[in-house]
Amino acid sequence: MRPSATRALANTFLALLGLGCPHPGAAPTPTAGEPELRVALAVGVQSVVLGGNESGELFVTDDGTGQAVGSIPAGARWIAIPDSATQGAKLRLVRPDGTATEPHTGIALVNVTENRFAMTNARRYRGRINVVAGRAGGGLTVVNRLGIESYLAGVVGPEIGGRRPDELAAVLAQAVVSRTFALGNRGRYESLGFDAYADTRDQVYNGVAVETPQAWDAVRRTAGQVLRYRGEIIDAFFHSTCGFSTAGVEEAFATGRTRPYLRPVSDQYAKGRYYCDISPRFRWREEWDAQKLRAIFTRTLPAVMPIGGDGLQPITDVEVTRTTRSGRVGELRIVFEHGDVRIPGGAVRSILRPEVDRTLSSTAFQLTGTKDGGRLTRLVAAGAGSGHAVGMCQWGAVGRARAGQDHRRILSTYFPGTTLDRIY
């Protein structure tokens, strides 16, 4: 799981049904007992353009009753919009001539031809697309419903990237971890009508376009396999680069309860060498002058403290006051001319940002400050790693694969005490 990210959503969402190509795949044979996953592609959008391509018409059904709503001719475009008469509780489909259908709580784009895929926002997806009104605080919700193995084929590549043949074990490990995470969190957004977001709030999912033979190979070779602890599917966190050691879950998340399988694990294999030292974010450095630091804190500190009408007070110091058991920042103290504020470790990356739109790479860092007249004029952070550091270190997994470790060993190392089980 990557760190949560709140993203601005566009007001218009494009949905097309397009003709698929043989690669990356004619529709795969479903695994027996394979669960379905509902993935939110967009939430709260104000219109969705629906259309068939030049090869054939698009069939649309009522999402609740299954009854036919209409057939969109090849090349035509209909638009789904919230129904004003029901204050957005339902939606209508507007035809090219301006006439509209009766209100529906939701509609489904039916995929009726083999090797064709539902398309939304110019991306192709397996399964079917549902457009639903009246959820998630208004607007329309666009959901892709598909088997979890097909979902994983669109997740593994974006999450761990294309890898060399000698790194395949890392891809297999990613497939297992991503499946475990998805199944362990299925139903988390039940009130919103889906199971997962298609971005870093859960896992990055980009559909058919990012499927590769390598991703499908990893998914098929690990089909149905998940990690369990004492018979229960685990919380399968993962991150880019631990930097030297993974972290306990309670170190990274304010509400994180201790779990025996989510504890610090060293990534060192020799003096001064680490499995993840091949990562471009293995070591990093950030610097702020007084003006930049003030601008950043003016934007980020209101989340944890009030700022008076006169603005932020001059900053006299920024210091680490507590470290965690894995050696990360457990608490950060920001000192002003009159008073201070203490930031818990889980919030540090969002408060001490390198840029307003970019969080700090990790909480594994040391600070050096320069002062003039008692005021902080320059702050430097020298750090290690990228991400929350809990669970599987992706670059560490790649390094371990290069060293000859198979995916079972990689998984048992990063999730000690767990078992690798096939559940369907």
Please state what every model-predicted region is.
Residues R2-Y424:
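Conserved, single-site charged/polar hotspot
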